[in-house]
């Protein structure tokens, strides 16, 4: 059995998230249906994460298995793209070692969230528009607090089936790109709804409704009700997933 990683991106506007579910089309379902047509048999895939409804991915990685070596992976990617809807794109397909796992072997995942205080008719579907001014300097100070903790229960969706709420934050901060402010966060793993809850709470700091110490208290409370409201998913992007080099065989 051979295993392959699919590198892909998608606009999540028209999908009910990544994972297959009964109440609407998902990205995973779209790809599996296209693979089934090409391979003439069901081909399940496993993604690096489970983005929520409306959330996008500049880069998502998923794995699938096939009994024999696939000769022309470039051609397979091209055929997949012909079958997939316009809001999903396969970038490439690469062979990996048989035990490689798109979800469990990922060493980091990076998300970006886009915020603006100015109205723009061209990016309103991909950026979160907020009225008034925000103190991004204070928000960046609050970001530093994230590195002092690993238990992020306060930013986790309630009643999930995860075994632990521990995550190791590797990077977190706000940068400005013209009229848009971008929150970038990288960690070994993320909880369900975690990034949107963190951004929502940081915005409370930016509005002056929550102090830096108050932000720390939210984390220490380990209570989702203490954190801010989750921001909408339409401005959230998964932008990178990393893996150990040993998962990728060296070509002769």
From Swiss-Prot:
Binding site for substrate: 111
Principal EC category: isomerase
Enzyme Commission identifier(s): 5.4.99.12
Residues forming the catalytic site: 52 (nucleophile)
Highest taxon listed in the record's lineage: Bacteria
GO biological process: tRNA pseudouridine synthesis
Keywords: Isomerase, tRNA processing
InterPro entries: PsdUridine_synth_cat_dom_sf, PsdUridine_synth_TruA, PsdUridine_synth_TruA_a/b_dom, PsdUridine_synth_TruA_C, TruA/RsuA/RluB/E/F_N
GO MF term list: RNA binding; tRNA pseudouridine(38-40) synthase activity
Catalytic activity: uridine(38/39/40) in tRNA = pseudouridine(38/39/40) in tRNA
Pfam families: PseudoU_synth_1 (PF01416)
Subunit structure: Homodimer.
UniProt cross-references to HAMAP family, sorted A to Z: TruA (MF_00171)
Family: Belongs to the tRNA pseudouridine synthase TruA family.
Main function: Formation of pseudouridine at positions 38, 39 and 40 in the anticodon stem and loop of transfer RNAs.
Protein name: tRNA pseudouridine synthase A
